[in-house]
């Protein structure tokens, strides 16, 4: 550290500080103060770097699961679908299909058992969007799947992820277990009449569409 920071070299000219619990006392500019970062409105990535991944109590302290609580006790499944439609939320794949419209296709189905499938297999070479989200903010994924289940009257969710990707697998499995331990998954979620289960399903080296 001293070798690179004590001299006016290219290393120091291109170094930035970031906020953390163990940050060094340095005079480097804070990376969050740069226009390309400070002018961002982070939504899907709002918790990245701000909470310990998989720590449910930090997540809750950062308003995590508050939308789920509101949906379960203040909204009907139909109202949740309409809220998602009105939000303009779209899929993050190539088609950018409206999420609320997709949910509305499943909601009226009267099947006794319905599943919410979450494809984090990410078989494209070099792709890391899904795995990155699992590693940094797994509880937001859990919350979104439960909301999906409530809105579509579904009973269970499977999270597909390729075997061998140990860090994201461990992160989402820990988050799911924490959700079960704290009444956010399983029977009568948060004391409501809605029950929902979730598990990870490991895939082989293949492409899941």
Where are these regions (language model features)?
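Feature of Fe-S/electron-transfer and energy-metabolism proteins
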Residues: 1-209
